[in-house]
């Protein structure tokens, strides 16, 4: 107990940010825990699957507009947090690039929706979901993370999501209300983005400094490898739902998506840990390599312990969890949940080896190369088995790919003699 109190005392900022992000993730995952059982029953597997397919499609444009800034800009702001002029310069350059990328994405989006019948048949739904990307473009998560003031994200998200939950229960009543649900999701994202942007400007005394071409190119260069990494990650995460939707009925997409939502809800603590720890480990590394290694060793032990508890619980109790949370109509989700139950443990390890160790040590290129190979493996497996095995094939593909990523990160840091283990 004394040792634990000492660790907390020596890492007050980290503990404070981790607590804020844990509460934020709790709020984020209470949201689906409250609404998921209601929505899967009201919408049914088909419409619920369609909504998730549309969300997976929109996620491609989120990847384009984010451009890896949630890591690269966070890292840069963390190092320069005491220089207000430099932080404003980074803020202005990154926001400008994200807005430009959004307009480029808009052109791509409208071309795809008008050219392919799969999308044009539900053009209204895809358009509504795409508008939500605006909110993600505007929300400067990388600023809050960089200055380690995550409690403000908590306040903004909880306030707006509370209104969203009430709106869903009041307005979404029947299967055909799926478009209304998409509108609610989009309004939530846009409101969060606008509120987060203006609050950050006022709270952190940010100024928009019209960026030069050199500054824009500098930010693009810094985020490039992480942008590629984001694309490769997306090809074996969000793309799984998208690929499944190309071959399977919407109802099958619903079975997989519902099981994955349950897994993500249980895995929520990882996002809190990753977001709060990343700027902290960068700061530690700037102070002392030994402190950096020592901290990541402790982080690894905690990750293994939490991962084993979460994954084994999901595997052992998959059937009652599906029955209680999703209902009898989603019985095919049980086997999916059992297969992907081990993802939390695997991803926890991957996070420590990759994001918290390789990226601070400037191994972005190798990080990106590993994820590129993972994306290729996932695509090969998916297009080989998903057409025949649908949701089971998607789950297997996801599991195999994540195992490959974690093992590759592990082998790399061992080869470089980085003593995290």
Task: Locate each region found by the language model.
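Signature of the first transmembrane helix
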Residues: 12-70, 106, 165, 225-251, ...
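Membrane-water interface segments that mark the loop-to-transmembrane alpha-helix transition
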Residues: 16-28, 54, 59, 63-113, ...
